[in-house]
């Protein structure tokens, strides 16, 4: 759920800046409690504090064409997370990055099976949602999943650089 939310944030950032990405990279860092409990026997690494932790999971997905479409970014990041993560381990940190980011020039090679009208409709919807968020705050338009247990989107939207910004509506308090 959190990875899907992070991919959605990435989608809005790319859309706002009129950028597209050729691939995304996901890194999942595990908590040291996995080693401290004594049951973990996999690969390890040393963190910046000198503690032994499980080796982080890392993976990249390349797209057929550069994109900033939410459907692609969200679905592919969720699949990548499922593929690279050890479900038996406690996750401490998740990082998602867009790679080979270029300006969105709107002209990309598509195959005969791509529904270009559907893609354009999705882009327009993303731009409309972004306009609403910019005008009324980041929490003005949310998916229902942002209200599920374990979701962090609403709290993330009220932060600046990972720290509390004061308001729960995603707007800065004056």
Describe each region flagged by the PLM.
Residues 1-174:
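Basic, low-complexity intrinsically disordered segments
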